């Protein structure tokens, strides 16, 4: 197995030349096994670097089978030799958590940046691409992949292992990334010094599963009929109605009817625009895989011994606050539980910049430099 630096695109942070680390032993069964780890030279360089790690041939998924992709890709940001923070987001998130010149704003630029709550002058940040892989050069699979949050956590562990990360100072996971953080804490109880879980619980809520099930059937219908773009757009429209609250929709959109039946209402125009914008962000097969992974998610809270901070929103319909309260009751080492209302519902972690910034700043303030 090799560790490689790839994609040396220019960013606002200084980048480095491509390099390859010494080969590491193969064997998916050995991921995360406690051993002396020597920090990779990549951790000793400032700036943004993509890192690719080969996936062992014996890396088996929880429900059987193997990955067709050959590597897992992460991206390092921030200060060399600084405490490392892992950041993971929803199923639309990727390794570009921070802005770059070619990609524009990262998916969480409001929280990750120079002098931001997750301060790149103070921390080293690692984000990674979830499996199955996606990109212009990746052929879409004919069938969805059955993958769990534990599988994703083990892929992350491959990156950490071969970067030589002895301790993760904090794993901050939001939505699907929060589920992965919980799975990581369950599988590797001593690797992360703390978990920060935002808008995620130990299991999905059945009503949220029902909504995602409708989205999956729309995607499957698109595959069967060859109307893939329309299916992705329509499924995204439905998803958008579950992310936000009725208060936000009520404040943003006029309920006045158009002049003729069959014409779009203003709120429908908005949803259709969001659906069209999402067509290039995913494929039906990948969306089916990750949507199913959310609904397959299960962890035993009692097995998570690392200190945990929970951040939940009382208006979140996808991850109801009651589920997070149950999680809080069952965690053996709950540090704090932040509960707030937001008109943005499940998307609050992306939209409530000041609120999230204040919480993260407080949570991370005592990490040693």
Swiss-Prot record:
Site positions per UniProt: Important for acyl-CoA specificity: 212
Entry EC no(s): 2.3.1.46
Positions marked as site (Important for substrate specificity): 176
Catalytic reaction equation(s): L-homoserine + succinyl-CoA = O-succinyl-L-homoserine + CoA
Binding site for substrate: 236, 347
Alphabetical list of Gene3D superfamilies matching this protein: alpha/beta hydrolase
Name of this chain's protein: Homoserine O-succinyltransferase
